[in-house]
Curated annotation (Swiss-Prot):
Domain of life assignment: Eukaryota
Phosphoserine sites (modified residues): 133
Name under which the protein is recorded: Histone H2A
Bias-annotated ranges (Gly residues): 1-11
Source species: Mycosarcoma maydis (Corn smut fungus)
Subunit and interaction comment: The nucleosome is a histone octamer containing two molecules each of H2A, H2B, H3 and H4 assembled in one H3-H4 heterotetramer and two H2A-H2B heterodimers. The octamer wraps approximately 147 bp of DNA.
Length: 136
């Protein structure tokens, strides 16, 4: 019999280093910091153990989604650095992100390019029928 102590784990296991809650959940966002902010923010009297993990996962997903779309916008503009303009284009061209961040103003973001179809020059791909309304 091995006396594993209070931990109940394997005795003498050197690889049992302290692991952060972010690492346990497979996240990059800080679960501990989010938990502290939820407790200090007076949102509720008590905060469950799963709430900061879930919130960190949601925030990480949203950040990854926005950064992926902004990276695509930067690549389309032949740039290697994401600027606020690329974030603006990414968010406003995505229907769901635009709905989520509809009331948000992005500094230095600019506006979406849009020209009404009536103002565009007529397409001259195919010539029109000769003498259409002129013949009487």
């Amino acid at each position: 019999m091995s006396s594993g102590g209070k931990s109940g784990g394997k005795a003498g296991d050197a690889s049992s280093k302290a692991q952060s809650r972010s690492a346990k959940a497979g996240l990059q966002f800080p679960v501990g910091r989010i938990h502290r902010l939820l407790r200090k923010g007076n949102y509720a009297q008590r905060v469950g153990a799963g709430a900061p993990v879930y919130l960190a996962a949601v925030l990480e997903y949203l950040a990854a989604e926005i950064l992926e779309l902004a990276g695509n916008a930067a690549r389309d503009n032949k740039k290697s650095r994401i600027i606020p303009r690329h974030l603006q284009l990414a968010i406003r061209n995505d229907e769901e992100l635009n709905k989520l961040l509809g009331g948000v103003t992005i500094s230095q973001g600019g506006v979406l390019p849009f020209i009404q179809s009536e103002l565009l020059p007529a397409k001259s791909g195919k010539p029109k029928k000769a003498g259409g309304s002129q013949d009487i």
